[in-house]
Amino acid sequence: MRRRDLIKVIAGLGAAWPFLARAQQVPKVGLLWHAGSEIEEAVNLGAVRQGFKDLGYVEGQNIKLINTFAAEQYERFNANAAELVALPVDVLVAVTTPAALAAQRATKTIPIVFVGAIDPIELKLVGSIARPGGNITGITNLAIDLTAKRLEVLKEVVPSAVRVGQLVNSSNPANARRFIAESQAAAAKLKLTVQPIEVGTPDDLERVFATIDHQIDAVSVPNDGMFYNERQRIAELALAHQVPLMIAWKEAVEVGALIAYGPSSTKIYGRVPYYIDKILKGAKPADLSVELPRRKLLHLSA
């Protein structure tokens, strides 16, 4: 090969090297979890990993998951989101409303996929369900009628119930306000009295159940990250205090809850890789519609 041709080849390789390097890089996905560890998020994280596997991804080879944990201290979401953005990651996954809001504050350019954010339009996470319009899209597991439907089913199963305690996470005010408004509107139609019961941290649960003992006829627990993580303890406390419990997750029925009504958590989290796969292949969050699971499952204690 002539010297001039060799120089051209070397120059061409040098120009192409950054593109080749980027092509060989493993995409990084940063996840903002609300719980404190992989063990606590085992079910949902497992669903995410299985979803990637089903799409042909192998963790560590052609996809890298970077998990961060807020340990139910939602102020940590801001720092965790900033840390992931600084790496940077290729996609952010935000679990719960506070995580989605923290991710939105952290970046306007990195694609964000939220899970379980309540009313993403009201929160101004997206412009619309069909066309989000920004760098954010995702899956909301909070159907508008879900809180009302839980009270309706609870009334059918426990017809003597008049006073219902509605647990709300005071550390998650956006969710709390929505749940209180929905439950009180539904209660009026069902001739129920709903009493909002604030829970700030998991450590409050024992005190809360001791306080409400014999003062209410049943307890309803909405979709919320902290309550999901504490679902077994909530069910056990309800059983110990002999209070009928309506909750969102079927696993709680096995340990003391009377009724569970809601969408499948594993199916919801299993859809997260679908969004990420689309984004990594060039789709924009602005054009990926928000999903709202339509199938809800009812489970009754035997």
Task: Go through the PLM ranges and name each one.
Residues M1-A302:
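Short hydrophobic alpha-helices and adjacent helix-cap/hinge residues
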